[in-house]
Amino acid sequence: MSIFERFNEETREFFQNIMDKEPLNYLEASGLYGVIAQGRYNVSVLETLYNHAQNAELKHLIKQAQDSLTKSLINRSEDLLQESGGKIPSVTFPRRTLHKAPLEIHPDARLTDAEVAIAIGSIAKASQLAMLAALHQSYQVEVALMYRTLLNDGLDWDYRLLQLMLKNGWLPKLHKVVN
C-alpha cells in the first residue's frame, strides 16, 4: 500500500467516523436503482389500470398506491441514491391522464374490476418481495428504515385491497378441506 493510498484510507475513515455515515454499498445502490426504474414502470401500469377500473373504491386504492406508495418510494430512493453520488436511471414512461369517469373501452378490450384488482395485487406482492429482499441487503439505517416503513404501509394497503376484493366477490370461494 502506497503512502497516498494509506492517506486516503485514513482520511476516509476519519470523515466516516465524524459523519457516521458510510456510502451506499453496491447492493444498496443497485437495489435503489432497480426500485426507481421498476417504480416508474409501475406508475405507468397503475395509470392504465386506473382508467380500466369502474369501481370508485378500487380507483381510490389505485390512486393511493400510485401516490402514497410508489411515487413516494421513487422520490425517497432517488434522494438516497443522489446523496451517495449514484446515477439516477434515465428510463421514463409516458404519463397517462387519470379519468374519473369510465372510459368507452370495448368490453372485449376492457379489464374487469376483478382483473384489475388481481393485477394490482400481483404488482403489490412483487413490489413487497423486492423491497423485502432490498431491506435484507441494506446496511444503511436510513435505507433500511425507508424500506421497512414503505413495506409496512404497502402491507396495510394490500389488506384494504383484500377486503375490497372479498366484499365485491372478486375472489373465488374456497371450500374447507376436510380429511
Question: Which ranges hold each PLM region?
Answer:
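A cross-kingdom feature marking solvent-exposed beta-strand/loop segments within repeated
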Residues: 13-24, 30, 57-61, 106, ...
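Carboxylate-rich helix-loop segments that flank metal/cofactor sites and access channels
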Residues: 4-15, 79-118, 177-179
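Conserved alpha-helical segments that form or flank metal/cofactor-binding pockets of metalloenzymes
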Residues: 1-6, 56-93, 158-168
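Alpha-helical transition-metal enzyme core signature, strongest for iron centers
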Residues: 32-46, 62-81, 121-124, 150-161
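Acidic/histidine-rich alpha-helical segments that form the ligand environment
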Residues: 28-51, 100-148
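Leu/Val/Ala/Ile-rich N-terminal alpha-helices, chiefly Sec-type signal peptides and the beginnings
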Residues: 1-39
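Preference for long, well-ordered alpha-helical segments
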Residues: 123-179
